[in-house]
Regions:
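Hydrophobic anchor at the beta1->P-loop junction of P-loop NTPases
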Residues: 27
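P-loop NTPase switch/communication element
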Residues: 47-98
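The conserved Walker
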Residues: 31
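Conserved P-loop NTPase nucleotide-binding/switch module
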Residues: 102-123
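Conserved lysine of the Walker
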Residues: 35
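A general structural motif
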Residues: 7-10, 85-93, 112-113
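Hydrophobic positions on the alpha1 helix immediately C-terminal to the Walker A/P-loop
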Residues: 38, 42
Length: 123
């Protein structure tokens, strides 16, 4: 079961930022190693900002409610003050909807799978 560990991304942020700007980042590891937990904390820190990065607007497509853990439309995990969540939305559709209508500075998704997801990333 996934859970929140605030601060678990502290050591990663210096490696994915430069002059308070964010590099494009892909987290890769075997199942069960904590990618989603790490992603959740990265989203929170990117949204709120800190000494490594300015606060940015983040759009999350949470197809299976694993990142935000939404219940009745309310995120149960803390994803930051500048984060919008599309819960239960297919990733490919959600990424395109975010780009077209919400214009986030960062888009975060968990588990890129099929060619539709890749096409949406290229969009």
């Amino acid at each position: 079961m996934s859970h929140e560990i605030l601060g678990c991304a502290d050591g990663l942020l210096p490696y994915i930022t430069f002059h308070r700007r964010l590099y494009h980042t892909l987290l890769v590891s075997p199942p069960g190693c904590g990618k989603t937990t790490l992603l959740r904390d990265l989203i929170r820190q990117i949204s709120e900002g800190n000494e490594f990065i300015k606060g940015m607007s983040v759009g999350v497509v949470d197809e299976r409610s694993e990142i935000a853990g939404c219940y009745r439309g309310v995120a149960q995990n803390h994803l930051g003050i500048r984060t919008d969540v599309l819960d239960g939305c297919p990733k490919a559709e959600g990424m395109i909807m975010l780009i077209r209508s919400m214009r986030p500075e960062v888009i975060a998704v968990d588990e890129i799978g099929g060619s539709e997801d890749v096409h949406a990333i290229e969009y």
